[in-house]
Amino acid sequence: MPKYMAEWIQWPERVKDVREGRYFDLPPAHYEGIFTLVCNFLCPHCTRRTTRLKWVDGGTWNHNTPISEANTLHPTGLRRVIDELAELRVDNQMGIIWGGGDPTSNPFTYDGMLYARAKGISASFLTNGVFLEVDRCLDADPTLIRISLNCGTEEAYRRFHGYPKGWDYFAQIKIKMRELVRRKIERRAKTLIGISLIIDERNINDVVAAAEEIRAVVDEVGPGIDYVIVRPVMNYSHFQRDYAMVRDGTKDRARYMVEPGGPVWTILNELGIPLILIKDSFDQKPEAHFYESDSDCLAYGLCGEIRHNGDVQLCSDSYGNPEYTIGNIFERPLRDILKSDRRREVLDRINGMKCYETRCPHNSRGHHHNRVFHQIEAMRRAGKMDEVAGWIDDMRACTHDLGHSFFI
């Protein structure tokens, strides 16, 4: 299923590091490629809102920010980043999540994806889809292309994504979804096509309409949508009070709509499209006692982030916060950055702030793997690592090696 959290047990070198407790040496499985912070939307709930407002020179929190070296990684730098990621490929595994901003805002994205593919780097492509160049994206053979739809009517779509009346973005995304599904079918592409539905008070009454729009795509073009992923808006710790914040009652209403028997689930079930709920997004954050045994981060090394200016982040869940920057790839090789004193200093500082407990999004891959790794460390302290070895072997025997890291 396209949100799978056990892939690390398929990677022998990484398993060896975890079993030996060497988390600082754990090779990254993929990097979030935040190679542009330009986007045509101003979503009130945007996870990169603070980044686009404060953590990029000149800011990009408007609809028509010009592409520049201040906000977008250009071809020479992009190739250097890709070359360095390829050198860190371990267990035949290194990937890039092409995000942003929106990757379609970056004119260098598609050529970069082709170059990365030639270097053995897998790709995940996350986009609002309005300006998606379908065939150029499929040419790069990404593991998945996921379009953030969220709404099924023009008014709700405009309100949810924060753009002015009169713009034709909703009409465009309807066209692009159909083109993407049609071309996937015609090309017999292996790329998985996903649709995401993020829910809060602004669109909760429109989510069924979004499911009906997905049905219309399938009816008109064919069965080319592989999954739909659903979660409520996340109230991230770096959000300011005037950002869109979801209420618990909205989460409960959303859960009813998407769980088995609910109206959204019913539509997608009739289509045979898996509906994946990000469970932790619906659930409350763990209580304080959950972190009492140890609140240090152990999962920081598994997935990272490289920003538009070459800054390397400690983990993939810091959303560009400069407090988590451990170096710059244009000043020092990535391999050296990962071994550096600065990385240790940043790690010590964020552990001193109890980041895992107080900042890390509890629906994130980092938080999930922290939970797993802390259980392993508890078993180590109890002298039960033989049981951990057996558990890993059992998990490996009953799970698939997907060949990529994006659903972990």
Mark where each language-model region is.
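Alpha-helix N-cap/helix-start and coil->helix boundary motif
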Residues: 40, 110, 131-132, 154, ...
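Conserved alpha-helical substructure of the radical SAM core
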Residues: 1-136, 143-144, 246
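Generic structural signal for secondary-structure transition and capping sites
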Residues: 90, 182-185, 342-346
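Residues immediately within or flanking Cys/His clusters that coordinate Zn2+
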Residues: 32, 36, 40, 294, ...
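Radical SAM enzyme [4Fe-4S]-AdoMet core and its adjacent flexible, acidic
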Residues: 4, 12-13, 34, 50-60, ...
